[in-house]
Amino acid sequence: MPLRLEIKRKFAQRSERVKSVDLHPTEPWILASLYSGTLCIWNYQTQTMVKSFDVTELPVRSAKFIARKQWVVAGADDMFIRVYNYNTMDKIKVFEAHADYIRCVAVHPTLPYVLSSSDDMLIKLWDWEKGWLCTQIFEGHSHYVMQVTFNPKDTNTFASASLDRTIKIWNLGSPDPNFTLDAHLKGVNCVDYFTGGDKPYLITGSDDHTAKVWDYQTKSCVQTLEGHTHNVSAVSFHPELPIIITGSEDGTVRIWHATTYRLENTLNYGLERVWAIGHIKGSRRVVIGYDEGSIMVKLGREIPVASMDNSGKIIWAKHNEIHTVNIKSVGADEVTDGERLPLAVKELGTCDLYPQSLKHNPNGRFVVVCGDGEYIIYTALAWRNRSFGSALEFVWSSDGEHAVRESSTKIKIFSKNFQEKKTVRPTFSAEHIFGGTLLTMCSSDFICFYDWAECRLIRRIDVTVKNLYWADSGDLVAIASDTSFYILKFNRDIVSSYFDGGKQIDEEGIEDAFELLNETNERVRTGLWVGDCFIYTNSSWRLNYCVGGEVTTMYHLDRPMYLLGYLANQSRVYLIDKEFNVIGYTLLLSLIEYKTLVMRGDLEQANEVLPSIPKEHHNSVAHFLESRGMTEDALEVATDPDYRFELAIQLGRLAVAKDIAVEAQNESKWKQLGELAMSSGKLDMAEECMRHAMDLSGLLLLYSSLGDADGMMKLAALAKEQGKNNVAFLCLFMLGQVEDCLHLLVESNRIPEAALMARSYLPSKVSEIVALWRNDLTKISPKAAESLADPEEYPNLFEEWQVALSLENRAAETRGVHPPAGDYCSHADRDHTTLVDAFRIMQIEEEGRLEQGDVLDEVGEEGEDGEEEEEEDRQEESSDGRQQNVEEEAVVVDADSTDGAVLVNGNESEEQWVLTPPQE
């Protein structure tokens, strides 16, 4: 059966001819040496060039990373080896290494050695700790030495490939080869070692269009791979997968099964001839160098093949080797969230096929391994073969039966004792099957659920499925798609009644068999159920759990990790990474149980469970309750003061919020509480909160609204002390303390504003402030200072200046007088004429009467002379009457005016001055 291998292109970049490629072990970098003489480092994640080195004008045929030194070493046709620091771009070393073109450089995995091979038929060993001294020369080939490579299982030996048609195996300590393989009919271009521990193999590629697999212990050819139509220029045993990769000048890359040597796939990206193949241990990425650029592909999935049973025993497959560990062997005090568990790994055995999936049955007694189109069922303890067969996919039922998908049109169901029960041929193309409570078959755009006993259709659902997870109870199922997952409830009783009643079921199945509970827009990578709680890792590598549609993030994972299982007695969920490191995280079973009971509406039972949840997890419970609209309960459960304060504010529980604010003594809390108290009409509490929060603007609003003059006085002093001059000014102004306002403006260096205010409210202070203004302005612009006019010097420039001076003393008597709010009605109906306007009216009346008197005088002079004295007496009486009326005119201060304007209130027959008491 064919090897099921996903191949995804991850990087493509056109360039000059690529002669060699290499992958960085930790950075997402590809190193490419070009025929044009340039070295390029590409980031395959961002698809951008990171570094570029102009090495020479001749071809650079080989380059490698030396990651432990942050170096790149390159050999070129100018016969020089160059070493660069890829971080600083500095050139570390340049030296002439050979007498002809340098074909290959190879870096020792642990020692400070670099091998180089050349068209001068020599291989040289260089030691960078000795200043790149040539410590050894290996002679023996009779033609160009095309490639050298270290043996990963014995780094003291290496192999060389030459156009003299041979492969030679060397020891670092000896100048002579250990042995020679007459490998091909034509020149050998490339060689690579098998990295697995079970086969002493190497592979070669030749100009005779073939690749050959050799056993270097028996010195025999194991297999010849035929299929390329031109020279084979690159060969590779993949370090992680059971495949061989060959590249040829025919433009194709062929993928062969490393065990069966069957051709699995052929890649052709249309970039002309293939010159190089690069890979790295621990990664499934493969980079290919062509005439016209580079391609990187990812082969298969990186999910580790592993399974954990309910007791904490883990079995995993690495290549064909099977290993086991037991989580219970680690003490509870040695387990820390997010840390790798120090587990003792035991070798359990080997597998006859390459495992692509591995899964325990529900009771943990058996383990199935599936791959290469076959399956084998082993006993979990002794690893004995119990059953086998053909299968593209294998799934367990919840009670120990199993099903296999042999093809898209044939599915077999087996009993608990591994006997075939039934063969099903679906009417559609079944691309996947899933086990669990029901047998599920998937096409490209829908899934169908069947019962295990009779394989009767239960329900068809139109959804594209990536994976499916059943809860242990069999009542809940999670269906994961590419972008979201759905939680469905399986109505077992409804299905049973349909079957028992013999009702007809159409092609859509039983409509009420499933009930959609919720949908979450997150991609599930791996998942499992614990009770009614669905635990999963998402596409952002966060470990989440979902209860009743409420998603909670447990941890942010720092690398890709995959769920193994949950141990209830430890209250921990376990994950594994691709390096088979096992990591545990705490997830309390009592917490899950509590949330489940709340979702079911069983609050009484939930409250009984609550005490079993440790206090440090109560905030998580409170957040959950709040999300369910149970804010009162959340306040009772929460322990974090900040969170409790937010809940108390949300509920309007001012007393609780105040107690928290008193303990915290946090300004923001006092301010927030003050605003709520103000809006709730709790003015005393609002005042207290604003004072604690130093919310002077809020206090100004409060005191001005209440008409609290004493509060305004205290606030003015506090604001001035705190440097809040705007608030202090408003307080003083509303209190009528104009002199203090002027002093505050002057102290704040707002002298122009002080002068303007004095002109309006204290004319007698204008000259004094203008003098200050001049002195201050002289420092900046003497000419501008001279242009300032003092009203004492130039009264003609100030309109009604004498009127203002006359009114100042009278206004001073009423300034600062604040009638109580209870007297508002007696003031509201009064005339709101300002003092200045009243004074103007008086002046106009006086001038009119004076003009009228002048006219009478003129008439008397032209008439009888005897009447002159009588007319004078009349004028004197009239003048005395007017003077008396003026003194009796009424003056009223407008209590609603913030500038303390004086109002005139009177009538034609009687005028009287009324002064409002001064405000303080």
Curated annotation (Swiss-Prot):
<feature type="repeat" description="WD 1">
    <location>
        <begin position="13"/>
        <end position="52"/>
    </location>
</feature>
<dbReference type="GO" id="GO:0016192">
    <property type="term" value="P:vesicle-mediated transport"/>
</dbReference>
<dbReference type="Pfam" id="PF23953">
    <property type="entry name" value="TPR_COPA_B"/>
</dbReference>
<dbReference type="GO" id="GO:0005739">
    <property type="term" value="C:mitochondrion"/>
</dbReference>
<feature type="repeat" description="WD 4">
    <location>
        <begin position="140"/>
        <end position="180"/>
    </location>
</feature>
<feature type="compositionally biased region" description="Acidic residues">
    <location>
        <begin position="854"/>
        <end position="875"/>
    </location>
</feature>
<feature type="repeat" description="WD 6">
    <location>
        <begin position="227"/>
        <end position="266"/>
    </location>
</feature>
<feature type="repeat" description="WD 2">
    <location>
        <begin position="55"/>
        <end position="94"/>
    </location>
</feature>
<dbReference type="InterPro" id="IPR056176">
    <property type="entry name" value="TPR_COPA_B"/>
</dbReference>
<feature type="repeat" description="WD 5">
    <location>
        <begin position="183"/>
        <end position="224"/>
    </location>
</feature>
<protein>
    <recommendedName>
        <fullName>Coatomer subunit beta'-1</fullName>
    </recommendedName>
</protein>
<dbReference type="GO" id="GO:0006886">
    <property type="term" value="P:intracellular protein transport"/>
</dbReference>
<keyword id="KW-0853">WD repeat</keyword>
<dbReference type="InterPro" id="IPR020472">
    <property type="entry name" value="G-protein_beta_WD-40_rep"/>
</dbReference>
<dbReference type="GO" id="GO:0030117">
    <property type="term" value="C:membrane coat"/>
</dbReference>
<dbReference type="InterPro" id="IPR015943">
    <property type="entry name" value="WD40/YVTN_repeat-like_dom_sf"/>
</dbReference>
<feature type="repeat" description="WD 7">
    <location>
        <begin position="350"/>
        <end position="392"/>
    </location>
</feature>
<dbReference type="InterPro" id="IPR006692">
    <property type="entry name" value="Beta-prop_COPA/B_2nd"/>
</dbReference>
<keyword id="KW-0931">ER-Golgi transport</keyword>
<keyword id="KW-0968">Cytoplasmic vesicle</keyword>
<feature type="repeat" description="WD 8">
    <location>
        <begin position="460"/>
        <end position="500"/>
    </location>
</feature>
<keyword id="KW-0963">Cytoplasm</keyword>
<feature type="repeat" description="WD 3">
    <location>
        <begin position="97"/>
        <end position="136"/>
    </location>
</feature>
<keyword id="KW-0653">Protein transport</keyword>
<dbReference type="GO" id="GO:0005198">
    <property type="term" value="F:structural molecule activity"/>
</dbReference>
<comment type="subunit">
    <text>Oligomeric complex that consists of at least the alpha, beta, beta', gamma, delta, epsilon and zeta subunits.</text>
</comment>
<dbReference type="GO" id="GO:0000139">
    <property type="term" value="C:Golgi membrane"/>
</dbReference>
<dbReference type="InterPro" id="IPR016453">
    <property type="entry name" value="COPB2"/>
</dbReference>
<keyword id="KW-0333">Golgi apparatus</keyword>
<keyword id="KW-0472">Membrane</keyword>
<dbReference type="InterPro" id="IPR050844">
    <property type="entry name" value="Coatomer_complex_subunit"/>
</dbReference>
<dbReference type="Pfam" id="PF00400">
    <property type="entry name" value="WD40"/>
</dbReference>
<dbReference type="GO" id="GO:0030663">
    <property type="term" value="C:COPI-coated vesicle membrane"/>
</dbReference>
<keyword id="KW-0677">Repeat</keyword>
<dbReference type="InterPro" id="IPR036322">
    <property type="entry name" value="WD40_repeat_dom_sf"/>
</dbReference>
<keyword id="KW-0813">Transport</keyword>
<comment type="function">
    <text>The coatomer is a cytosolic protein complex that binds to dilysine motifs and reversibly associates with Golgi non-clathrin-coated vesicles, which further mediate biosynthetic protein transport from the ER, via the Golgi up to the trans Golgi network. Coatomer complex is required for budding from Golgi membranes, and is essential for the retrograde Golgi-to-ER transport of dilysine-tagged proteins.</text>
</comment>
<comment type="similarity">
    <text>Belongs to the WD repeat COPB2 family.</text>
</comment>
<feature type="region of interest" description="Disordered">
    <location>
        <begin position="850"/>
        <end position="920"/>
    </location>
</feature>
<dbReference type="Pfam" id="PF04053">
    <property type="entry name" value="B-prop_COPA_B_2nd"/>
</dbReference>
<dbReference type="InterPro" id="IPR001680">
    <property type="entry name" value="WD40_rpt"/>
</dbReference>
